[in-house]
């Protein structure tokens, strides 16, 4: 009886060791994409994604996978000139991405959960469920719809539209288009490098805006203070509207 129990225990341990050898693996796989890419489509449920432009007009994808047992195929696909990051790498597998694309590439789609870092791309129209969003040196219009997470934007040459639910929004070096920012909970900080129309709506959080002069200014807060160091030029060519339900509003001239 004892020998039988010992045999069963040995088999259980051996099976556990066998499973351990296949479970919880990580890998970094780099792929060169031969197609000429001009659009990246975000379609992953859970992924940290970093996209930057290259100087040699090439596209590469590095998949950082965490998986059990075996890898199954690639976690991306190519359709014509569109690179799709779908995170589809098999059972109990997740993939993060580091992507390099040609200049002039736009980013569209939806990232369910995870951080999003985009540098030098030519425009963005994307949704993000949960995670931090960092944008830098974007050369076209940006449209973001966010559920939860902070947003940081540096040096944008285009129109900015951001709608957030929870998280701080901070943007500087804005030029080339109107600015529309709305969030339910979180602070909003904007620094405009050139004058353009600005519309900011907050519910709970402070609003700080730095901009050139020459604005027709309207402000409103139900619970908080307003400090307007920008002035109000009734003959100004651009309008600035800043409202929040609960929070302070500060306007400064750069």
Model-derived segments and spans:
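Hydrophobic membrane-insertion alpha-helices, especially the h-region
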Residues: 4-21
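Residues that act as N-cap/strand-start positions at coil-to-secondary-structure junctions
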Residues: 25-27, 36, 68-72, 93, ...
């Amino acid at each position: 009886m004892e020998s039988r129990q010992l045999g069963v225990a040995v088999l259980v341990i051996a099976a556990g060791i066998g499973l351990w050898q296949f479970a919880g693996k990580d890998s970094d796989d780099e792929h060169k994409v031969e197609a000429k890419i001009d659009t990246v489509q975000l379609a992953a449920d859970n992924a940290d994604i970093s996209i930057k432009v290259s100087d040699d007009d090439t596209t590469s994808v590095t998949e950082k996978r965490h998986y059990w047992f075996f890898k199954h195929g690639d976690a991306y696909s190519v359709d014509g000139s569109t690179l799709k990051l779908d995170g589809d790498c098999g059972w109990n597998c997740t993939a993060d991405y580091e992507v390099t694309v040609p200049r002039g590439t736009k980013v569209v789609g939806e990232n369910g959960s995870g951080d999003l870092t985009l540098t030098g791309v030519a425009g963005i129209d994307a949704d993000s469920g949960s995670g931090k969003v960092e944008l830098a040196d974007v050369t076209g219009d940006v449209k973001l719809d966010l559920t939860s997470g902070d947003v940081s934007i540096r040096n944008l040459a285009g129109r900015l539209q951001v709608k957030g639910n929870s998280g701080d929004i901070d943007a500087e070096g804005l030029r080339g288009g109107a600015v529309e920012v709305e969030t339910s909970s979180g602070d909003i900080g904007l620094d405009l490098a050139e004058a353009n129309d600005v519309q900011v709506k907050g519910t709970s959080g402070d609003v700080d805006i730095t901009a050139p002069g020459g604005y027709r200014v309207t402000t409103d807060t139900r619970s908080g203070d307003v400090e307007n160091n920008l002035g109000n030029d009734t003959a100004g060519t651009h309008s600035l509207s800043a409202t929040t339900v609960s929070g302070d509003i500060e306007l400064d001239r750069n």
